[in-house]
A protein has these predicted regions:
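Short acidic/glycine-rich loops and adjacent helix/strand connectors
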Residues: 1-284
Length: 284
């Protein structure tokens, strides 16, 4: 049962505030009339060392491409991100200077965090949980089965093959901010027609009968670069990515949005139908 939940941006008024959520944590503690010493587990939403492994292996696999991106990412990781537990302890002491129980701090795999947030508040004792996003540590799409108080991941699709990153690539192409403006791309879709759907299927993503997929990395930069797409992607659609400061949204962009929206929905439906057939679980 969820007792309290809050987003830091609601307190700071900073959209997508990525700082330690001091105000949100303090709110849920106050709301539930608890102190840190009363809490059994404090869980961080991903495993930093696994994510760091993915970054290193990706840069090695794509080398010498991506050196600029690599050189920008490494100082941040070596200075801060590899020491999340220490950082969390320091921040938690702002709520209670006497708190020192590091054993209470746990790290959950990113997609397991998503699955738990969907399954445990649900009315189901058993369900299939399908998670699809940009990328967690390695996983971009996972299938899990939840039974009562247990969760088990059954299948994974790994980076760089990602439906979320494909959608973000089109977010970038149409001139919206990645990891922020995806909802704008979705909102644009009903105003267009999916005339580029087959071009996406034929060039960018190979979808298997069970809904699993591979992305053609010849068209993307996100694995190691500083942008989502490359010139080959732009050439495929006959336009460069829209500059939101100089270019208005045209019917072309609406049709692009409609096309990637249909592709995304079709792949998700294909995945769900395949999983329903394989696992014989009615709840999703």
């Amino acid at each position: 049962k969820i007792v309290a939940a809050a987003q830091e941006e609601r307190f700071t008024r900073i959209k997508h505030d990525s700082s330690y959520p001091f105000n949100a944590v303090q709110f849920v503690l106050n709301f539930s009339k608890l102190n840190l010493k009363d809490i059994d587990h404090i869980v961080f939403y991903e495993k930093p060392f696994l994510k760091f492994e993915r970054l290193l292996e990706t840069y090695v696999a794509f080398a010498p491409k991506g050196f600029i991106s690599f050189s920008k990412a490494m100082p941040v990781w070596l200075k801060d991100k590899l020491f999340q537990k220490k950082m969390l302890m320091n921040e938690l002491k702002r709520h209670d200077e006497n708190f020192n129980d590091t054993k209470k701090i746990n790290f959950s795999e990113h997609h397991l965090s998503h699955a738990a947030s969907a399954f445990y508040p649900s009315p189901f004792d058993e369900a299939l949980i399908l998670t699809a996003d940009g990328v967690g540590e390695w996983a971009t799409t996972t299938v899990a089965i939840g039974k009562k108080n247990s969760l088990e991941i059954k299948k994974e699709i790994h980076f760089p093959h990602s439906l979320g990153l494909l959608y973000s690539a089109f977010t970038y192409f149409t001139g919206f901010k990645v990891n922020s403006g995806e909802y704008k791309l979705m909102g644009l879709a009903p105003y267009g027609t999916p005339k580029f759907k087959e071009k996406i299927y034929n060039n960018l993503i190979d979808v298997k009968d069970d809904g699993s997929f591979n992305l053609n990395q010849d068209f993307f930069n996100y694995a190691t670069g500083l942008t989502m797409i490359n010139q080959k992607f732009c050439n495929l659609f006959g336009r460069k990515n829209r500059n939101p400061d100089k270019e208005k949204i045209e019917q072309f962009h609406m049709d692009i949005a409609a096309s990637i929206q249909v592709v995304t929905e079709e792949i998700m439906i294909k995945l769900v139908k395949s999983l329903r057939s394989e696992y014989k679980v009615n709840n999703l």
